[in-house]
């Protein structure tokens, strides 16, 4: 079964994220558990936790259908010791918040070398950061997102994801989230079913589907291989509809959150309905 949703706002309280997801007929959702552009946040109150869990129960969202995202400020591969420590502390806090909320996944961008250390050193720092966070938490899987490769961001090659996983001690609590826009911008073609087959055959060989814990379904304003991260609505960008239809009809993408981060929230309900219909199309055929 496919879990299909969007990254919804948690404004006014975390419970509202589940309510907003239900309003667009989503069977999955993503959210920030705190302000994504601030380092610190007030601890979660018992009331906030209880209200969130109650809303998820009311609208039938289990932890397998929810893909929280951490703060954009965190850089787990930071070249400077003090800044790395700050990022690690913030990441542990994000993991602990998920733990408190009964969530089992935390999606994050791996990190950037800022032109100050080698890719290999940065990837090793990211893996070490994950190990530290896993040691201090329970039950939450660290889900590494592939990137478009803007600036000095790592994670734009499947080999980067594999190298990070290789350095993580507890393989049962690490996974990846593949963002289609990021992959396309990083040079993984998705414009035809044949290209999708090739890209995900590479993914299976280099990383492995057992590590796929979520996806971000985004078309791309950015051009192929441009290393520029610019999302678009499904079918309106340079990837086109075929990739998303192909994903919907492949059972390797079952049982994980498939999350829209497309640019027009007003049509998320339509995009979700369209994605759901592609599954039915296969079933009828």
From Swiss-Prot:
GO terms for biological process: base-excision repair. It catalyses: Endonucleolytic cleavage to 5'-phosphooligonucleotide end-products. Keywords: DNA damage, DNA repair, Endonuclease, Hydrolase, Metal-binding, Nuclease, Zinc. It comes from the Bacteria. Its EC number is 3.1.21.2. Binds 3 Zn(2+) ions. PROSITE patterns: AP_NUCLEASE_F2_1, AP_NUCLEASE_F2_2, AP_NUCLEASE_F2_3, AP_NUCLEASE_F2_4. One of its GO terms (molecular function) is DNA binding. This is Probable endonuclease 4. The lineage of its organism: Bacteria, Pseudomonadati, Pseudomonadota, Gammaproteobacteria, Enterobacterales.
């Amino acid at each position: 079964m496919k879990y299909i949703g969007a990254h919804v706002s948690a404004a006014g309280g975390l419970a509202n994220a589940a309510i907003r997801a239900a309003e667009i007929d989503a069977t999955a959702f993503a959210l920030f558990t705190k302000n994504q552009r601030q380092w610190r946040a007030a601890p979660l109150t018992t009331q906030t936790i209880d209200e969130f869990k109650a809303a998820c129960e009311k609208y039938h969202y289990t932890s397998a259908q929810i893909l929280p995202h951490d703060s954009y400020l965190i850089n787990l591969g930071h070249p400077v010791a003090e800044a790395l420590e700050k990022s690690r502390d913030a990441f542990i806090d994000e993991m602990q918040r998920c733990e408190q909320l009964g969530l089992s996944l935390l999606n994050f961008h791996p990190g950037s070398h800022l032109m100050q250390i080698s890719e290999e050193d940065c990837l090793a720092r990211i893996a070490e950061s994950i190990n530290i966070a896993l040691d201090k938490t329970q039950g939450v899987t660290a889900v590494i997102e592939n990137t478009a490769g803007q600036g000095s961001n790592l994670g734009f090659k499947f080999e980067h994801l594999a190298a990070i996983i290789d350095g993580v001690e507890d393989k049962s609590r690490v996974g990846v989230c593949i963002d289609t826009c990021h992959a396309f911008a990083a040079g993984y073609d998705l414009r035809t079913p044949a290209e999708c087959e090739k890209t995900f055959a590479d993914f299976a060989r280099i990383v492995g589907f057992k590590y796929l814990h979520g996806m971000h379904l985004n078309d791309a304003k950015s051009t192929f291989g441009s290393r520029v991260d610019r999302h678009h609505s499904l079918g309106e960008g340079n990837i086109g509809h075929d990739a998303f239809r192909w994903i919907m009809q492949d059972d390797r993408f079952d049982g994980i959150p498939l999350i829209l981060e497309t640019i027009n929230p007003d049509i998320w309900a339509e995009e979700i309905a369209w994605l759901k219909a592609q599954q039915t199309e296969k079933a009828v055929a």
